Amino acid sequence: MAKRSKAYEAAVAKIEEGKFYAPADAVTLAQDTNPSKFDATIEVAFRLGVDPRKADQMVRGTVILPHGTGKTARVLVFATGDRAEAAIAAGADFVGSDDLIEKIAGGWTDFDAAVATPDLMGKVGRLGKVLGPRNLMPNPKTGTVTVDVAKAVNEIKGGKIDFRVDKHSNLHFIIGKVSFGAQQLVENYAAALDEVLRLKPSTSKGRYLQKATVTTTFGPGISVDPNVTKVLADA
């Protein structure tokens, strides 16, 4: 195991072992214990009481974080004609059809989100093995298969993110940067949590939100009290 840096060990020392922090305290502590010299990303991971192998327990959706993630997403749009022009005007980073499909089939995935018009999904669907594992496949349920590509691009650039529970029943969200105000981080955390709770499958039995952890890019994990579900009321 690689030896931890002195900065990391100092960060760990500030976190009370076995304690579950309120969300507001957790994000403040994450800012205070960031061992990196750069403006690190702050992420939250939720462990859910679901079995993602069962279709009726797959938790997937979108959320618009009120303060964004701290970085501007690189958006790719599969479109032609007027819709391609609309995507370009909206600020899409990559726009095309067959050319992009061929490039992605070769393994290129240097973008953060993908949008497609319905008429191109027959071709885009063939990229499932490349885009699927990276959660980049356009999907009508997340608003990324649409004729209104400009709206989709604007929402993604404005902080809308897609999420899907992984095979270990975890969900991961970027909620901002260390440089964010603490209240901004709390409000982003609350937006993510509210949507996760709203999407609880009816077939999920027992405790749904089992664990929550806040961390910076290279920082230690900070356990958040999973019983606090009304975050802004308790902040």
Curated annotation (Swiss-Prot):
PROSITE patterns: RIBOSOMAL_L1 (PS01199). Pfam families: Ribosomal_L1 (PF00687). Keywords: Repressor, Ribonucleoprotein, Ribosomal protein, RNA-binding, rRNA-binding, Translation regulation, tRNA-binding. One of its GO terms (cellular component) is large ribosomal subunit. GO terms for biological process: regulation of translation; translation. It comes from the Bacteria. Coiled coil: none annotated. One of its GO terms (molecular function) is rRNA binding. SUPFAM superfamilies: Ribosomal protein L1 (SSF56808). InterPro entries: Ribosom_uL1_bac-type (IPR005878), Ribosomal_uL1 (IPR002143), Ribosomal_uL1-like (IPR023674), Ribosomal_uL1/biogenesis (IPR028364), Ribosomal_uL1_3-a/b-sand (IPR016095), Ribosomal_uL1_CS (IPR023673). PANTHER family: 54S RIBOSOMAL PROTEIN L1, MITOCHONDRIAL (PTHR36427), LARGE RIBOSOMAL SUBUNIT PROTEIN UL1M (PTHR36427:SF3). Belongs to the universal ribosomal protein uL1 family. Binds directly to 23S rRNA. The L1 stalk is quite mobile in the ribosome, and is involved in E site tRNA release. Protein L1 is also a translational repressor protein, it controls the translation of the L11 operon by binding to its mRNA. Part of the 50S ribosomal subunit. NCBIfam families: rplA_bact. This is Large ribosomal subunit protein uL1.
